[in-house]
Amino acid sequence: MSTPLQGIKVLDFTGVQSGPSCTQMLAWFGADVIKIERPGVGDVTRHQLRDIPDIDALYFTMLNSNKRSIELNTKTAEGKEVMEKLIREADILVENFHPGAIDHMGFTWEHIQEINPRLIFGSIKGFDECSPYVNVKAYENVAQAAGGAASTTGFWDGPPLVSAAALGDSNTGMHLLIGLLAALLHREKTGRGQRVTMSMQDAVLNLCRVKLRDQQRLDKLGYLEEYPQYPNGTFGDAVPRGGNAGGGGQPGWILKCKGWETDPNAYIYFTIQEQNWENTCKAIGKPDWITDPAYSTAHARQPHIFDIFAEIEKYTVTIDKHEAVAYLTQFDIPCAPVLSMKEISLDPSLRQSGSVVEVEQPLRGKYLTVGCPMKFSAFTPDIKAAPLLGEHTAAVLQELGYSDDEIAAMKQNHAI
């Protein structure tokens, strides 16, 4: 089966989550991704949050499937020579080291262009080069704080909150992936590679665009009618935290379901659509609300939206969350159960679709990983296990033309 990126070679100089999530997707699309790791150590996530002693952690295995791993010491002359040969044959190089790290290895963008003018150089940093925070070390929650997510997440009477979703890390990797694929297409037209940079702050901000929309509306109006603070609360000069509100034109909230007293996830998310208000009233046994002026329009409902949700919750709290969703769906009401990670890991539909995949790695054995979220009609990504540290060092060096004796000498000289 042919794959979209078959024949594309990627040098993966990334670690932790933002870079590996990008290069893993390239590997799923068929690229030959060579993960370059420090001899004897490897990606730091191999050792972080281990569940089995002395075995690659799930943190690593779930972000590095389908790749090849080589151990290479680029501080040695032999290591630099290998690196130059790899660059000469590669299509893409991706890195997410601290600013200047690749330059200090002797591989500036200018030098890389001299070696291989067709190479596409992908780079992830916490902040853009023109940012006052350019030298700040960035991780997931740092990016969420600086990108506008934290200030707009949480409840109005509490502190800013960070999201459990990897808005700063994996999201940045997905944004860079888009840029790299665009650069590959551009190379088909120009014959030359280019540098693609992605800041974690920018990636978070791109997902917070509706909050930038709301800031401009707030500046003009002094209020935001879809937020729970309207009309009885107060608005400051910045977009407030809205709790579980929908954030768009459709009010929504988390509602209790049967068993909530002991099950922390016995809830559903319920959305009220203006165009579906009549069905909503019928579903919750409030047909009089359809024509009642206090409820018949979104503008009329907003002042007592929490009273409305409390009334709806009187129904949802009597039934299981899955039963609630099944019932409400008959009335075309947008809703979903709050699914725990335990439920997601056991969901047969996610296994069937390939969204959750079981793979097997030597030493670790079988484990679950997230599969490719995109579903293609012409091919299905074959999700394979993450590589062991240095598993493919000899094979990659042989492909570059090194003999067994030369490889043995490099090992003795601590170049690999």
From Swiss-Prot:
Pathway(s) where this gene product acts: Metabolic intermediate degradation; oxalate degradation; CO(2) and formate from oxalate: step 1/2
EC number, as in UniProt: 2.8.3.16
GO BP, sorted A to Z: oxalate catabolic process
Binding site for substrate: 248-250
GO molecular function, one term: formyl-CoA transferase activity
InterPro entries tied to this protein: CoA-transferase_III_domain, CoA-Trfase_fam_III, CoA-Trfase_III_dom3_sf, CoA-Trfase_III_dom_1_sf, Formyl_CoA_transfer
Catalyzed reactions per annotation: formyl-CoA + oxalate = oxalyl-CoA + formate
Residues at which CoA binds: 17-18, 38, 72-75, 96-98, 104, 137-140, 273-275
Pfam family, one: CoA_transf_3
Active site: 169 (nucleophile)
Keywords linked to the UniProt accession: Transferase
Assigned protein family: Belongs to the CoA-transferase III family. Frc subfamily.
Assembly and interaction partners: Homodimer.
Protein's job: Involved in the catabolism of oxalate and in the adapatation to low pH via the induction of the oxalate-dependent acid tolerance response (ATR). Catalyzes the transfer of the CoA moiety from formyl-CoA to oxalate.
Record HAMAP family: Formyl_CoA_transfer (MF_00742)
NCBIfam families: oxalate_frc, PRK05398.1
Descriptive protein name: Formyl-CoA:oxalate CoA-transferase
Gene that encodes it: frc
